[in-house]
Amino acid sequence: MTAQLIDGNALSRQLRTEVAARTAALKSRGITPGLAVVLVGDNPASQVYVRNKVKACEDVGFHSVLEKYDASMSEEQLLARVQALNNDPSIHGILVQLPLPKHIDDHKVIEAISPLKDVDGFHVASAGALMVGQVGFKACTPYGCMKMLESIGMKDLRGKHAVVIGRSNIVGKPMAMMLLAANATVTVCHSGTADLAAMTRQADVVVAAVGKRNVLTADMVKPGAVVIDVGMNRNDEGKLCGDVDFEGVKQVAGYITPVPGGVGPMTITMLLVNTLEAAERL
């Protein structure tokens, strides 16, 4: 058995077409969704991510603002810029690209963003809303993973066991909460888990999100399981790869996401969805 691919590029194109149509409808009422992206420093990976986000905005008809600052920018200066963007009525979403320089407190900056413009879904208000099932912005990567599950008919996960590998605030924790909201029975595994394979072999859905190559191999996967690979790593040849041993696991799984072309494009797409919804809520 060879797993079916869940094509993140194809699903992203479909969703972005819907976003563009809803954006056009908003524009006819005089509202153009606006996203401000703030980049501090010259991290090469961050520069690529930021360019991709700005281009995606332009492609669906958003107004986008890219603010680039030198790595020497002070925390106080950055907080002042965030406050100015909070007060700008043409901006509906604010994204501060992480990581920030070491002298700036990531948490303090994220909490300075208005919850009404927290389209990354990282603010404690967004995390709290997710926890208690209220309306709020969902973290983009796990939100994209849920859309991928939905695309293969797995919107309701009642009776399914989902295992999340990783407990970060950006992916692991919100992923677990979204799976729980979809009625899955959820297990969260991490560096303190005694027997990871014993957990994953029981899983109908596995989400790997630790940033470590080959954390999930074929012998750890239940036949027919759905495997979502959030990882972004480089192999020995320097090529992009995920957390999953793709070649091995695809022989066992029922569905699998590739890297690249899986979760990555969905993350940016859900950022667009969140920004659009921020504008629609006005």
From Swiss-Prot:
Family membership noted in the UniProt record: Belongs to the tetrahydrofolate dehydrogenase/cyclohydrolase family.
Job description of the protein: Catalyzes the oxidation of 5,10-methylenetetrahydrofolate to 5,10-methenyltetrahydrofolate and then the hydrolysis of 5,10-methenyltetrahydrofolate to 10-formyltetrahydrofolate.
InterPro entries linked to this entry: Aminoacid_DH-like_N_sf, NAD(P)-bd_dom_sf, THF_DH/CycHdrlase, THF_DH/CycHdrlase_cat_dom, THF_DH/CycHdrlase_CS, THF_DH/CycHdrlase_NAD-bd_dom
GO molecular function terms noted in the UniProt entry: methenyltetrahydrofolate cyclohydrolase activity; methylenetetrahydrofolate dehydrogenase (NADP+) activity
Binding site for NADP(+): G166, R167, S168, S191
Protein name as it appears in the record: Bifunctional protein FolD
Organism listed in the record: Acidovorax ebreus (strain TPSY) (Diaphorobacter sp. (strain TPSY))
UniProt record, GO biological process: L-histidine biosynthetic process; methionine biosynthetic process; purine nucleotide biosynthetic process; tetrahydrofolate interconversion
E.C. number: 1.5.1.5, 3.5.4.9
Catalytic activity: (6R)-5,10-methylene-5,6,7,8-tetrahydrofolate + NADP(+) = (6R)-5,10-methenyltetrahydrofolate + NADPH; (6R)-5,10-methenyltetrahydrofolate + H2O = (6R)-10-formyltetrahydrofolate + H(+)
GO cellular component: cytosol
Disulfide bonds: none
Superkingdom of origin: Bacteria
